[in-house]
C-alpha cells in the first residue's frame, strides 16, 4: 500500500517478493522528527509447485505493518499473519496472505500548532482519547491521540 510520502512497491514477479509498503512522511511539528502514515506491505501466497520467498512485503517507514504469508503445505513457523500499522502514527496494515486477514491500520494523530500570542484554550476530549499540550519557540501545540472528539473552549 502507498504511504503519505511515497507509492507502495510492486512485486518482483508472479511468485516473487511481495511489494513493500510506501514510505510515510516525516514531520517535526512536535519538536521531534517523527515519520507518520507508512503503507502496509503486500501479502504473499506460497505455491508449492513453483516455490516463493517465505515472507510478506515489508511495511513502509512510518510504521506500516508487514504483509502476511500463506505458508507451504504442512509447514509451520512462518509469519503467516499480517501485522497491524502502529497506533498513533497512522500506518497502514499489512496485506493478508491467501486465506488470512490483512492487518488493521493504525490509529492516527491530530496535531495543532498556533502562535502563543493567541489566547490559550482549554482542550476537552469526549468519547475516548488523550491530549497533550506544550509550548516552545513562540508556539503552542496540542497533540491528540484517540477515537473521541477534541473540542477547544
Which role fits each region the language model picked out?
Residues 1-153:
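Low-complexity, glycine/proline-biased repetitive segments and flexible coils/loops
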Amino acid at each position: 500500500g502507498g504511504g503519505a510520502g511515497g507509492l507502495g512497491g510492486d512485486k518482483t514477479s508472479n511468485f516473487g517478493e511481495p511489494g513493500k509498503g510506501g514510505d510515510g512522511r516525516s514531520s517535526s511539528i512536535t519538536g521531534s522528527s517523527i515519520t507518520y502514515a507508512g503503507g502496509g506491505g503486500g501479502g504473499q501466497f506460497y505455491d508449492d509447485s513453483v516455490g516463493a520467498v517465505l515472507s510478506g512485503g515489508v511495511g513502509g517507514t512510518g510504521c506500516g505493518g508487514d504483509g502476511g504469508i500463506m505458508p507451504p503445505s504442512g509447514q509451520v513457523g512462518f509469519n503467516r499473519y499480517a501485522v497491524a500499522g502502529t497506533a498513533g502514527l497512522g500506518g497502514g496494515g499489512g496485506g493478508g496472505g491467501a486465506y488470512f486477514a490483512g492487518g488493521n491500520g493504525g490509529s492516527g494523530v491530530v496535531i495543532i500548532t498556533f502562535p502563543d500570542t493567541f489566547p490559550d484554550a482549554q482542550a476537552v476530549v469526549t468519547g475516548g482519547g488523550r491530549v497533550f499540550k506544550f509550548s516552545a519557540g513562540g508556539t503552542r501545540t496540542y497533540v491528540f491521540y484517540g477515537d473521541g472528539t477534541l473540542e477547544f473552549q
